Amino acid sequence: MTIAPLSASPMQLSPSPAGQTGAAAQASAQTATPQAMAATAEAPGLAALQSVLAVARQSAASSQDGLAVLMANVLRATATGNLPPAVQSAVQQLMGLHLSTDKTPDADAVKNAMASSGLFTEATLAAGAEPPVDLKTALANLAREAERWLAKTPAQNQPQTQGASPNVPPPMRGGPPTAQSPAAPSLPENALPALTAKLLATGSEAALARQTLLQMASLPDANKPAESRWIFDVPLMTPQGAAVAQLIVQRDARGTSTESPEPVWRVGLAVDVEPLGPVRANLALSGGHAWVTIVADRAAALSKLQKDSSWLSDALALVARDGDIAFQSGNGATAPAGRLVNSAS
């Protein structure tokens, strides 16, 4: 994947906590800017705001789940051909937001995935724009239409489903990126419509709770208002089914030394698809230099990635970046030392 520094345009919108629209969303969008956060750092109501956010975070963490199981259920439900038109339309909107794996994603594809991640839904609405076509909007539409479908089922026929354990840990600020591998559907084959509606509704609500946590993890830190961080999930469609990668994009306030005073951009990526299995990549950009570290859990995957890494060297040279590339084993063993890529040579 060729990743260039992302422009500031999609990042000018600060993420807002879930459930805010209209005036509330506008107020949230305004107060979520780094400048406003710094200005209100000592405001009397800050403790109350932090308390509200803590309660909301705890509530979302207890009910969140990833997209992989929901998308697996969506694929199984779609295969029956029995979905009501409104539910089918909501399903198509959701599934249309996955990142294509037919070709190697470039920087524009990653930028578009970030813009449609759902991080900026309320901020976009507060700015007076049309409702965005993004993950959060699509999940809300599916949850609403699945609930309406379920409501048409007689109460005595509605299934009583047990709350399943989450398949992915909740996202937390400062944590590493976490991938979701393709999951088996929890929806049985030939399931009754009521059960299909129930699982689509509860799965969408759990994914929406996760969106809330992603937005909270992406809010500016009042103690570091000049630094920016965005964490978001990216659905993928693979031959094994629907998977979800996670990206963390971060901009430090300034460089780490007087020799490198420019801000440092950092990108963390986690993905878990066959045949490579769990893979994580970390990219740092400062000035004209790039540092890339690729970590794989499987020895065979690590060997293949290292063997096929010439494209990464070429990509760095193409954008005139000197670069250090290192490969590491996820089990603690370290691969042979990385190499220096000199774009001037």
Predicted regions and their residues:
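Extended non-catalytic alpha-helical interaction modules
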Residues: M1-P278, N282-S345
